[in-house]
Regions:
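Structural signature of tandem alpha-helical TPR/SEL1-like repeats
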Residues: 23-33, 58-70, 92-104, 126-138, ...
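Class I SAM-dependent methyltransferase SAM/SAH-binding core
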Residues: 280, 286-331
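A short acidic, Gly/Pro-enriched loop at the edge of an enzyme's catalytic core
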Residues: 332-342
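A short SAM/SAH-binding and catalytic strip from SAM-dependent methyltransferases
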Residues: 340-354
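A short glycine-rich, Lys/Arg-flanked "PGG" loop and its adjoining helix->strand segment in the class I
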Residues: 355-367
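Conserved beta-strand signature within the Rossmann-like core of class I S-adenosyl-L-methionine
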Residues: 368-375
Length: 380
């Protein structure tokens, strides 16, 4: 069976209409359109592929997998069906099969740039920088000089500690466009990671000339000039964690066997076995503490700068409210004597100096309340 008809295609119009309807969120209409297409062509892999995309958009992940696996079964060598399955696997944090499927489709369609983009995205989601670099190099053989591919390659090389090669790529991009802010910032980060802050100073000056007052550029400028700012800018952390939100639990809990939320939750429940308390979870992230606590007889309030992380936490349905603000503002603006427990797990590394944090936490705790926080040990 072929996924695409060689001559007149009796269902092409249906497929195009259904794809548009899915994109607009018109899922009932899309289902009706796909039913019409299937009546004309019962075993067309394209129908099942679109049905999978529709099911995922409707929140039916199981149905999405069933439809996409049916699509692949009908057309095992059809690239688009395989790619959509691989992308779904990656979005659901099933990285091993996602990577295997992505590599398969890359071999089937080595010159397809849409496939290349999907494969690189899967590699990044799975934390496989080496895989991403390999496919980015292949992409640059297909489209030499592509700016976006070079930016991604340089960033991945920097992440792998291959600073010299990363700098070569950044240098080439900046020579081509001296006002390329993404490349300038990339070179700054690479020079800082390579232990050459003084060499990054000129680039931070250029960045601040291009975007005066930018807090992220000002932060890196301070580092390049040998000054450690008291706090990281909120915008920097928001961008970082928005990008990590969908894969955070997979990497921390399953990959790194992260146990701190459970340890703290156990301590809280040991002191409050009836669960009658109010908890303020600062830097709540994807809601791991809430998952370990479960529903409590009181308020569980989550605070995080990342909207995407809060979206993940909301799915657990254990938090009563969320506030998308930074930790310092949350503490400063909260009235006193409200919470039995405040938690701040693995967030102080991002907020920096604690001179304001600890007194404000003490102020809003009830008498005899508990403040659980963690710090990282570092070499002298």
């Amino acid at each position: 069976m072929s996924a695409t008809a060689p001559h007149a295609d009796p269902i092409r119009q249906y497929l195009e209409t259904a794809r548009t309807q899915i994109a607009k969120g018109e899922l009932r209409q899309a289902a009706e359109t796909l039913n019409k297409a299937q009546k004309k062509s019962p075993n067309d892999a394209r129908v099942f592929m679109l049905a999978g995309l529709m099911a995922e958009k409707a929140g039916n992940v199981k149905g999405a997998f069933e439809a996409l696996r049916k699509s692949v079964a009908l057309a095992p060598t059809w690239g688009p069906g395989l790619l959509e399955l691989a992308l779904l696997l990656a979005r659901q944090n099933q990285f091993q099969e996602a990577v295997e499927t992505a590599e398969k489709v890359a071999k089937l369609e080595p010159k397809n740039l849409l496939v290349l983009a999907g494969v690189v995205d899967i590699a990044h989601r799975a934390g496989h920088a080496e895989m991403a670099v390999r496919h980015l190099r292949r992409g640059l053989e297909l489209v030499p000089g592509d700016v976006q591919l070079r930016r991604l390659l340089a960033a991945d090389l920097e992440g792998l500690g291959q600073h010299a090669e990363a700098l070569d790529v950044w240098n080439g991009l900046i020579a081509q466009d001296p006002k390329d802010q993404q490349a300038l910032l990339g070179r700054v980060k690479t020079l800082l990671a390579a232990g050459k802050p003084a060499q990054a100073a000129a680039d931070t000056t250029t960045l601040l000339e291009l975007a005066p007052g930018d807090s992220v550029y000002a932060y890196y400028s301070a580092l390049a000039h040998g000054v450690t700012p008291p706090h990281q800018p909120v915008e920097l952390n928001r961008h970082l964690f928005d990008g990590l939100a969908e894969v955070y639990d997979q990497h921390t809990v399953r990959g790194l066997r992260y146990q701190l939320p459970k340890i703290v939750a156990d301590k809280i429940l040991a002191r409050y076995p009836d669960k009658h308390l109010n908890v303020l979870d600062l830097g709540c992230g994807t809601g791991l503490l809430g998952v370990c606590l479960g529903r409590i007889d009181g308020f569980l309030i989550g605070v995080d700068v990342s909207t995407k992380m809060i979206e993940q936490a909301h799915r657990h349905r254990v938090y009563d409210r969320f506030h998308t603000v930074n930790l310092l503002d949350a503490l400063r603006e909260t009235p006193g004597d409200i919470y039995e427990v405040i938690t701040a797990l693995d967030v102080f590394i991002y907020t920096g100096e604690l001179g304001e944090t600890i007194p404000n936490a003490h102020r809003i705790l009830l008498p005899a309340g508990d403040f659980y926080f963690s710090c990282e040990a570092a070499p002298e």
